[in-house]
Amino acid sequence: MFTLKKSLLLLFFLGTINLSLCEQERNAEEERRDEPDERNAEVEKRFFPIVGKLLSGLSGLLGK
């Protein structure tokens, strides 16, 4: 029983460290993304697929 508790405690400890490292990495990425160039690239990535779908839908309607 004692070995089971030790191994569970070790897994919990390692999982906590892993989550902490992931959170730090995510925060660093968010800080880098706050730069204006990155925000513009993000908007372009979201904007162009929507425009493409609209244009293809309109061309399909006009082609009929």
From Swiss-Prot:
The lineage of its organism: Eukaryota, Metazoa, Chordata, Craniata, Vertebrata. Keywords: Amidation, Amphibian defense peptide, Antibiotic, Antimicrobial, Cleavage on pair of basic residues, Fungicide, Immunity, Innate immunity, Secreted, Signal. Expressed by the skin glands. Its main location: secreted. It comes from the Eukaryota. One of its GO terms (cellular component) is extracellular region. This is Temporin-ALf. InterPro entries: Frog_antimicrobial_propeptide (IPR004275). The modification Leucine amide is found at L62.
